[in-house]
Amino acid sequence: MKVIFVADLHYALKQFDWLLGNAASFDAVIIGGDLLDLGSDLHLDLQIVVVEKYLRLLRQKSLLMVTSGNHDGDNRNEADESVARWIRESKAEGLFVDGDSLELAGALVTLCPWWDGTVTRAELEAQLARARQSVQGRWIWIRHAPPAGSPVCWTGHQFAGDESLLEWIQRFTPDMVFSGHIHNAPFYAGGSW
C-alpha cells in the first residue's frame, strides 16, 4: 500500500493543486490538519468552500482521510472550545474525517480531531478508548499535534508537543502516530521529520 501524509497546507492552493495532481499515485491520501489559514485575509467561510471542493476532487482519486488542526476551527462548542464542524460535515464516501476509524491494509486507522479544552480533550480520549476495542492488528493514529518530548515537536527553542497525546500513547499503545503542526522541527538540531 502506498500512502502520502501531508499536514499544515494552510490554504496554500499550489500545494493543494500538487496533491490533487498526484493523489491518484497513492492508495490513500492523509491530510493531518491545518487545511485553513487563520492568518489569511480571506475569511474562513470562503477558505472552507474552496478546500471542500479540493476534498471532493481528492476523494475521487484516492481514499482520503482528513483530521482537523488548530487552524481549522469554524465553530465553538458549549464550552467555548474551537471545533472544526465543517470537516465532520464534509464526510462522504471515500472521505474519512475526525472521529472515524477505518481498516486499512490490516491496520486500524483512527482520525483524531484537534482538542481545544477539557471537553474536546475528553471526547478524543473517549474516542480512543472506543477504538481500542476494535484493534485486532496494528493501530495507527492521525493527529495534528505531535506528542510531547518527540523530536518532531522541537521548535528550535522548546518542545511544544501534546502532553495528553503522550499519555494516551503510553496508555493505549498505538503502533504509529502521524502528526504535523510544528513546521520547522526538521530544520533544527535535535528536530526531525
Q: What spans do the regions from the language model cover?
A:
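Conserved beta-sheet core of the metallophosphoesterase superfamily
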Residues: M65, W154-W193
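Core catalytic region of metal-dependent phosphoesterases/phosphodiesterases
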Residues: Y11-L104
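Extreme N-terminal starter segment of soluble prokaryotic enzymes
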Residues: M1-I4
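Conserved catalytic scaffold of divalent metal-dependent phosphoesterases
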Residues: D72-S164
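Short, conserved loop/helix-junction motifs that constitute active-site signature segments
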Residues: A23-A24, L55-K61, Q133-V135, I169-F172, ...
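Short, Asp-centered acidic motifs that coordinate Mg2+ and/or phosphate
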Residues: D27-A28, M65, R138-I140, D175-M176
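Short, solvent-exposed loop/turn segments at secondary-structure junctions
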Residues: L13, L38-G39, G149-P151, P186
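Active-site metal-binding loops of divalent metal-dependent hydrolases
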Residues: A7-H10, G33-L36, N70-D72, D100, ...
